[in-house]
Every structure is written in structure tokens, then in C-alpha cells.
């Protein structure tokens, strides 16, 4: 009976102690170790045994539960470790072995985390087996009560095995893997039994070893070591791939793309955080820091071949950029950065000493017997800071971020006003005609290159990155002159000019900026599209302002010619005086238009662009963190768009209509020689008054007064209404039932 009991404690049943589940099976059919676990103990004393007292029976049945738990825990450990493939390494053909492993993977869903937990369970079961062996030796050597000795020797396992069995039961039932498995163990560690807590913490430690190995691969080498999809960092295309796909298949897919494309894809959308696999005790902020650190290390360890080729060529530019940055960053810039710059320009983007430092920090976490959240957070933050600092060195110093930002400001934000003034003057006559779908872009290239020749210095190395684009049109686009002619009927009929929703075809003028690695990490397509949005707005504003000036100069020049001709011919010029007197109210309208456009332009260029540029420069000089720079730059662009009212539909639509009216007014004014009828000008003036006063009403509306944009709206309104003339005009017009075609003096 002693040996029956000892064997049962090790999971082997016999005649005295039986397994009810096995008895239900057909005789001679082997028991399948992969069958689902039983929810309750199936080890029982044989019912036909009558020589055992009821009290002893109860004690034996209590003891043999340990044998049941041992067997189930042992089966779980063997199944999870699944090392049977080792036996066939030398006896099976490699292709057949690969097929077999693939089949086993599909059937059993391998998990490195389960394997680690199984190793921890194996350690506990080893202690249990030693205890059973010690009991056997003691019973054979001494004459002691059997049941009392066994109970005393295995008493601590009554506390350990039932909770452990509940853990593996939950794991098997819900197919828990990866970070979810760590969650289960971490929650169960919070218990009041010291022995059980120590045991569960050991299992959690085994699971953390796998996580730390994955973190080391990711944060030291930029490699995602996750063959079974259990890490909380995943590839973006993992949703399209079966988690059972081998690492070789993923590598083969990535090999089809170039290193350059892969690097950009990995940075922008290649990886993401899987919330299902992120342990609850790791905050989302830390998960994002781990994600960023790994992506940054990938970038630093895998630079673009073109960038490596240009390394020696850009050495002098690098040092100049580094000195310029230090000059802006005050006198307390660390001296160690000088050595770092030398190392970066001379060789590695991520020095081996830094990689060793990261690896040492992760190794300290790995060797700790318990998981300390504070230590984990400090380590992750330190690694992230190292990665962000070296990425900052790469982008800001080596790739000259400030130079690119200045170039975008020069060309997309019209900082080089002389260039765009020259370009608009050279292309003025061309833009009076409809843009041709086939040659519109090439037509514009002539004045564009001519303006560049006149105004752009040879040392401007960034101009070569700027190119002019004229998108093809999907619909028929009318020119400005055609809009003016076809709108005559509606103007004569006093219809609303804005009912015609077609836009000037030349408003689609676009700039493109060529960005190389690694600046593509900073200047994404989304960022460049925001720059383009502001550029198209500013170039229209610049063109409108120029047309208002040119129309005045053109008509004045024509008037002087006529006056000189009349004096030469000895005529009294009464007809010319009458025409000049009749059109004088229109010049007041033109002045009002120029006043509004000029102040809008001054507000955007000075109050918005220049002020936000200074804020951005301060952030760049004070920060050495790449992610902070990205955030500051996003704030800069958002401020440009928001403070220019491009995201306020009511304001932007009215300003758009006002610019169209200004252009139509200018072309009508210049055509007065051939078409002396002023009714069209009067209708344009009337419509402009309406739009101008609507703009004032919106700027003063209570709806926008409480918004975040209220200070900028008030600043723009202050420029327009610095002497209360704008307000008085608006009130006067709004109180009149029928608007007048001309503004009062």
C-alpha cells in the first residue's frame, strides 16, 4: 500500500488508487496526454477496498489529490516545452522535419512564454519529487506512521498545487499566451500566502526572462524577436499575416523591398503596440517609449546607403551645423557632445559603448528576482533618452534640420519675397489665360526658372530640392479672365458672385520639396501637405496684393499718357476729366481692398509666421530629444494653419471670396479703356462691401470669442480696425437697406 500511495503521489494510478477518467475509457485505449484538463480531481480510492477506515480513506483521498495535480502540472509542462523535435534532428530529413514542425505549430500553437512558465513549473515539481523521495527514504528507514509522515512531508504542497492547477487550467481553457500570461500571473501574485506568492513570483520571473530577451533584441539591436506573435510590439502587417508564419517568411517578404523603403515604412507605420499583449502593469506611455526606442535603434543601425556614401562629403557641413547649434544653445552645452559629434561623423550613428550601456541596464532588470515597476520605468526612460538623443544628433546636426526648416520657410511660407514677386511678375500675363492641361506645368517653369536666375544665389543649396508642380485637372478649369467674362450676367443681374463655385485654375500651383534620408523621418507626407496648404494660400494672397498694385500703376500710367497726349494736341481734356471723376469712387474701393489684403498679408507673415518661427527655433535650441522636436514642429504647423484661419470655414471662405473679387476688380479696372461701362465695377464693389462687412461680423461674433483662436482673431481685427474706420464702415453698411456701390469718404 505504501508504494501504491507513493506512486499515486507521482501521478501513477493502479489497483488501489484509480483514475475515474481513465476508467470511463475503453479498456486497452491509451490515454491521450493532450486531452483537455479535468476541472476536478479524478484520483480516487478503489470502491471495493473495505479494509481502510473511513478516517484513513478521507486522509488518503486528500493526499492523492496532490498526485492528480502533479500529473496535470507535469503534462502541461511537457506539452508546453514540446522538445520532442530534438530526438528527430539526426534521423529525419530537414524538409520533412520542417513540415513536421510546421504541422505541430499549427496544431499546438507554440508559445515561448508558456515554455518559460513550464520551466518554472518543472522546478516546483522537482522540489515535490524530492520531497516524495525523502518521505520514502524516511518510511523505509524508520518505523513511523505512514499517513502522518506523508501528510507532514507534503503539507506545504496543499497550499501550492491547487492554485497552480487553477492557473494552468485558465491558461489551457482560454489559450492564454504572451503578455496575457504575464497578466494572469501578476494578478495571482497578490495573495496573502507567502509560500504561494513566492512560487507565483518565480513563475512570473521565468515569463519576464522571455520579455527581457525580446526587449534586449528590440532596444539594443532593433530586431523584433517574436516568432509566435506574443510580444506587445508587432509589425503593422501582422494582421494580414497568420501568427503561425515563420520568421523566414517575414524576412523574405521584407527582402523584396529596398533598405531605404523598409526603413521609412518601419519608422512611420511598420510597427505598433498590441494592446492585447501589453501587460496591464506596463503603462501605455512606457509601451510607446519602448516602441520608439526600438524604431530609433533600427534607424541608427540601418542608415540609408546613400547617406553612408555622403558621410565623408558632409563632414564639414556637419561640424558647422554642430557649432551653429551649440551657439544657439547657450554656454552650458555639455563638452562631451564634441566627442560625440566626432564619433558620429567618423563612424557609427550608435556607438557600441551606448549599445553596451543599454544592454547592461536590461541585464540588471533581468537578473532581479522581482519585477520592480519603478526600476523598469527608469530603465525604459533611460534607453528612450539615449535613442532620442542620438536620433536628434542624426537629424538636427548631421542632416541639418534647421537648414531644411529655413528652406521650407523661404519657399513654402514665402520668406523669399523677392523671388515670388519676380515669379508672379514674369508669369502675370500667362496667368491671365486658362492653364493648359498638357503644358500648364512646363509653361510655368519658364518664369519660375527666370525668377530663380534673377533672385536665387548660387550658394542656396536647398533651392534644387524645390520643384514647381501644376496638378492635372479632372474637370474643365476656367481662367480668371473667363470667370470674369462669364460672371458679367450674374453681376448685372445682381446675383451672388459666390454661387459660381469654380476656382481659378492657377490656384492649384504647388511646390514639392525633395527630402532625403533621414529627414524623411521628420518631414512626412502629412507634414509637407500642410506646408503646401499654407503655400497655396499665401501665393494667392501675394498674387492678389500684386494685382491690386499693378492695376493702380497701369491705370495711372495710362492716365498720364492720355493727359500728355491731350496737352500735346491742345485739347481741354474734359472727357478724360469726366472719366477720371466717374471712376474715382472705384479707387476708394481699390484702396479698401488693398488695405484689407495688405493687413491680412502683414498679419500672417509677421504676427503668425515670424512669431511661431521664433518659438520653434527656441524649442530646437533647447531640446535634444527627437520626439520633442517632432511635437514642437507639429505645434508650429498647427499654429500656422489655425492662426491663418485656414481651419475656420466661415472665415476662410469669406477671405477666399474677397481675393476673387479683388482679382476681378483689377481686371475690370484695366479693361475700362475698351469697356468704359462702370456697372460691373459697381456690382463688384457692392459684393465686396458685403463680404468685407460679413468678415467684420464674424471676427466680432460671440461664437468665436470664447474659442482658443479668439486672441488671434482679435489681433487681426486690431490691424484692420486700428482707427475704427473698419468698424464704422461695417456698421454704416449693415444699417443701410440697399448697399451703395462705393464706399464713403
From Swiss-Prot:
Give the InterPro entries listed for this entry. Cro/C1-type_HTH (IPR001387), GCP (IPR007259), GCP_C (IPR040457), GCP_C_sf (IPR042241), GCP_N (IPR041470)
Respond yes or no to whether keyword Phosphoprotein is given for this record: no
User: Which GO molecular function terms does the record list?
Assistant: gamma-tubulin binding
Which Gene Ontology cellular component annotation is one that this UniProt entry carries? Answer: cytoplasm
Where does the UniProt entry say this protein principally localizes? cytoplasm
Keywords of this entry: Cytoplasm, Cytoskeleton, Microtubule
Which cell locations does it reside in? Cytoplasm, Cytoskeleton, Microtubule organizing center; Cytoplasm, Cytoskeleton, Spindle
Q: Name one GO biological process term.
A: response to nematode
Inducing or repressing factors: Up-regulated in galls upon nematode infection.
Complexes and interactors: Gamma-tubulin complex is composed of gamma-tubulin and GCP proteins.
**Function of the protein:** Gamma-tubulin complex is necessary for microtubule nucleation at the microtubule organizing centers (MTOCs).
Family membership: Belongs to the TUBGCP family.
Q: Which PANTHER family match?
A: GAMMA TUBULIN COMPLEX PROTEIN (PTHR19302), GAMMA-TUBULIN COMPLEX COMPONENT 4 (PTHR19302:SF27)
The name on file for this protein is Gamma-tubulin complex component 4
Upper classification of the organism: Eukaryota, Viridiplantae, Streptophyta, Embryophyta, Tracheophyta
Amino acid at each position: 500500500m505504501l508504494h501504491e500511495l507513493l506512486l499515486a503521489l507521482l501521478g501513477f494510478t493502479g489497483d488501489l488508487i484509480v483514475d475515474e477518467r481513465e476508467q470511463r475509457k475503453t479498456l486497452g485505449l491509451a490515454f491521450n496526454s493532450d486531452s483537455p484538463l479535468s476541472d476536478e480531481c479524478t484520483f480516487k480510492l478503489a470502491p471495493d477496498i473495505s479494509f481502510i477506515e473511513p478516517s484513513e480513506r478521507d486522509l488518503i483521498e486528500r493526499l492523492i489529490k496532490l498526485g492528480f495535480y502533479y500529473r496535470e502540472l507535469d503534462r502541461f509542462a511537457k506539452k508546453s516545452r514540446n522538445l520532442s523535435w530534438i530526438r528527430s534532428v539526426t534521423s529525419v530529413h530537414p524538409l520533412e522535419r520542417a513540415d513536421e514542425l510546421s504541422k505541430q505549430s499549427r496544431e499546438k500553437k507554440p508559445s515561448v512564454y508558456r515554455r518559460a512558465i513550464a520551466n518554472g513549473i518543472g522546478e516546483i515539481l522537482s522540489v515535490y519529487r524530492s520531497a516524495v523521495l525523502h518521505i520514502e527514504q524516511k518510511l523505509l528507514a524508520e518505523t513511523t506512521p505512514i499517513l502522518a509522515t506523508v501528510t507532514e512531508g507534503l503539507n506545504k504542497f496543499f497550499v501550492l498545487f491547487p492554485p497552480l492547477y487553477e492557473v494552468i487550467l485558465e491558461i489551457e481553457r482560454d489559450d492564454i499566451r504572451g503578455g496575457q500570461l504575464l497578466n494572469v500571473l501578476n494578478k495571482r501574485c497578490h495573495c496573502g500566502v507567502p509560500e504561494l506568492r513566492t512560487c507565483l513570483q518565480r513563475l512570473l520571473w521565468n515569463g519576464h526572462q522571455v520579455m527581457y530577451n525580446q526587449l534586449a533584441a528590440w532596444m539594443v539591436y532593433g530586431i523584433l524577436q517574436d516568432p509566435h506573435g506574443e510580444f506587445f510590439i508587432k509589425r503593422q502587417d501582422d494582421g494580414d499575416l497568420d501568427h503561425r508564419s515563420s520568421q523566414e517568411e517575414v524576412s523574405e517578404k521584407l527582402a523584396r523591398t529596398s533598405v531605404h523603403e523598409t526603413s521609412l515604412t518601419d519608422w512611420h507605420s511598420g510597427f505598433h503596440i498590441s494592446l492585447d499583449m501589453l501587460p496591464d502593469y506596463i503603462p501605455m506611455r512606457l509601451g510607446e517609449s519602448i516602441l520608439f526606442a526600438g524604431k530609433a535603434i533600427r534607424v541608427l543601425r540601418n542608415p540609408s546607403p546613400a547617406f553612408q556614401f555622403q558621410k565623408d562629403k558632409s563632414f564639414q557641413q556637419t561640424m558647422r551645423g554642430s557649432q551653429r547649434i551649440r551657439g544657439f544653445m547657450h554656454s552650458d552645452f555639455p563638452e562631451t557632445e564634441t566627442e560625440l559629434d566626432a564619433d558620429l561623423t567618423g563612424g557609427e550613428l550608435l556607438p557600441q559603448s551606448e549599445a553596451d550601456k543599454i544592454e547592461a541596464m536590461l541585464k540588471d532588470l533581468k537578473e532581479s528576482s522581482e519585477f520592480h515597476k519603478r526600476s523598469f520605468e527608469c530603465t525604459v526612460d533611460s534607453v528612450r533618452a539615449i535613442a532620442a538623443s542620438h536620433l536628434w544628433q542624426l537629424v538636427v546636426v548631421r542632416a541639418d534640420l534647421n537648414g531644411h526648416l529655413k528652406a521650407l520657410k523661404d519657399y513654402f511660407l514665402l520668406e523669399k519675397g523677392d523671388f515670388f514677386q519676380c515669379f508672379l511678375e514674369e508669369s502675370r500675363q500667362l496667368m491671365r489665360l486658362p492653364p493648359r492641361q498638357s503644358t500648364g506645368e512646363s509653361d510655368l517653369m519658364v518664369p519660375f526658372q527666370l525668377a530663380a536666375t534673377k533672385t536665387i544665389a548660387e550658394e542656396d543649396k536647398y533651392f534644387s530640392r524645390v520643384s514647381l508642380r501644376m496638378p492635372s485637372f479632372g474637370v474643365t478649369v476656367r481662367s480668371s479672365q473667363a470667370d470674369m467674362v462669364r460672371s458679367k450676367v450674374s453681376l448685372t443681374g445682381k446675383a451672388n458672385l459666390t454661387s459660381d463655385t469654380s476656382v481659378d485654375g492657377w490656384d492649384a500651383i504647388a511646390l514639392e520639396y525633395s527630402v532625403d534620408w533621414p529627414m524623411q523621418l521628420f518631414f512626412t507626407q502629412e507634414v509637407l501637405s500642410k506646408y503646401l496648404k499654407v503655400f497655396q494660400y499665401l501665393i494667392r494672397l501675394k498674387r492678389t496684393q500684386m494685382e491690386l498694385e499693378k492695376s493702380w500703376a497701369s491705370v495711372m500710367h495710362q492716365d498720364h499718357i492720355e493727359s500728355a497726349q491731350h496737352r500735346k494736341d491742345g485739347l481741354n481734356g474734359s472727357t478724360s476729366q469726366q472719366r477720371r471723376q466717374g471712376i474715382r469712387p472705384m479707387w476708394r474701393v481699390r484702396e479698401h481692398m488693398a488695405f484689407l489684403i495688405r493687413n491680412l498679408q502683414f498679419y500672417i507673415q509677421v504676427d503668425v509666421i515670424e512669431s511661431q518661427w521664433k518659438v520653434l527655433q527656441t524649442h530646437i535650441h533647447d531640446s535634444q530629444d527627437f520626439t520633442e522636436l517632432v511635437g514642437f514642429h507639429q505645434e508650429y504647423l498647427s499654429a500656422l494653419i489655425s492662426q491663418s484661419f485656414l481651419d475656420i470655414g466661415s472665415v476662410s471662405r469669406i477671405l477666399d471670396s474677397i481675393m476673387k473679387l479683388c482679382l476681378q476688380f483689377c481686371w475690370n479696372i484695366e479693361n475700362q479703356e475698351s469697356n468704359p461701362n462702370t456697372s460691373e465695377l459697381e456690382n463688384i464693389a457692392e459684393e465686396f462691401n458685403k463680404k468685407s462687412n460679413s468678415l467684420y461680423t464674424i471676427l466680432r461674433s460671440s461664437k468665436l470669442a470664447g474659442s482658443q483662436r479668439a486672441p488671434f482673431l482679435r489681433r487681426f481685427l486690431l490691424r484692420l480696425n486700428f482707427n475704427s474706420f473698419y468698424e464704422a464702415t461695417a456698421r454704416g453698411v449693415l444699417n443701410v437697406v440697399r448697399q451703395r456701390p462705393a464706399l464713403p469718404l
